[in-house]
Structures are given as structure tokens and as C-alpha cells.
């Protein structure tokens, strides 16, 4: 049952079908050197096996570096969103525990903290949406909604200070917590706006294609009809690594390999609402 539950989602994976299609094309292509070996041209233009082995090593190192670089971006993004979960919980606790707020102020804090992750998600996807934020919906030419939300929180904190609800020490504690939100936002923007160098991506793809085009010609003499499945298997893994790297290097989208930002947003929303609601009853 566990194996079936693991394989079923994979079998419906978009990446799987993309890679399998490419592997099938190279499998069909690998019939050419087999045909040549059984034709009058069998001794013409044989590819030295040593050349192919050297090319395999080079492409292997390129793919390792390519995959590691892409995954490092994905993992950094996941770490930042994990930090956002913690920052939201800490802010909810300190904003409601350090200050005895009226219910209206609590609702404002809850609304702003709950909406920040959704605003950041949409901002990283270039999908600004103000429908759930009536306070800022009417402001014109808003380009950075996460900053506006934090600015609204600072306006509330400034009001609390001028009203005597918090002192200077409490203000510094709250400022430290709120500053984390825009730090995380800026780090996410750095990942989003600094893609892997396009020339490097193209160069890696060209090397993979060159290797796969020469692979069956280098092994057909030794493996005969086994050249077809070996070529398909090699193409599957090499193209698969390149495809996975391409998908995970942009972690904020909607693909199946991207971060589950919707789930993380709802986790933060539920945590903030639970913390503030609990504080209100104590």
C-alpha cells in the first residue's frame, strides 16, 4: 500500500511524462547506429569509445553542479518561509502579550499578520490582489503590498506608543520582530529576481544533447540491440535531472515541484488567529 501511494502520484507527474517522451525519441533515434552496424557502412565513421567516456564525465559534472545550484535556491526559499512561520507566531505572541489592546486593535493586528504571507506569495508570483485588504485597496499605484502591510502595523505600534500603551523597551522588542518580515521578503525577492545565468542553462542543455546524440554510436558495436534500452535509460536520467533542476530553480510558482506556498500561508493564518484568539480570552 505504501509503495502504491508513493508511485501513483509519481506516475501522474507532468515531469515524468515530459522526460519519458524525450527518452522515447532518443530510443527511436538509437536504431540508426544499430542499422549502420548491420549495413554495408558498418566500418565507416565509428565513434571512439574513449571520446564518449570523456564527454560523459564532463556532462556529469555539469549536471551535478546544475542540480545542486537549483536545489540550493529551492532550499533557501523553504528556509525563508519557515522563518516567516516562526516570525509570524512570535509577532502575534508579543504584539498581544506585551500590550493590553482593545478588541478592535487585536482584530487589526490579526488581520494584518494573517494577510502578510498571502501578500508575499502573490508578490513573488507577480499577482497583486487587494480584494481582502479594504484598508489599502483604494490606494493608487501600490507596487509592494507586503511593505504596505508592515507599514500599517508600524502605524498601529506608533499609535500605541503615543497613547502610552507601550514604553520604549517594548517598542524595541516589537520593532525587532516586525523588521524580520521585510528582511524575509527582501531575501525572497533576491531569489526571484536573480535567476541562474541563462548562458549556463543553455550550455548545460547543449552538452546533454550532444552526449545523448553520440551515446548510441559509441556503444552499439558492443551492446547491439541493448543499445536502445540503454540509450532510453541514459536519456531518462540525464534529461530528468536537467528538467528537475529547471523546475526547482524558481521555487515560488505553481508547479508541482515548487514550494507549497498556499499551505504555508494557511498555516501562518491559522497560527496567528489561534494565538491572538487565545490571548483575547486570557
State each model region's role.
Residues 1-82, 101, 223-225, 269-282:
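N-terminal juxtamembrane/topogenic regions of multi-pass membrane proteins
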Residues 75-123, 267-282:
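Acidic, Ser/Thr-rich low-complexity segments on the non-lumenal side of membrane proteins
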Residues 93-200:
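Structured inter-helical modules in multipass membrane proteins
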Residues 74-91, 177-185, 191, 255-261, ...:
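Intracellular alpha-helical coupling/juxtamembrane segments of multi-pass membrane proteins
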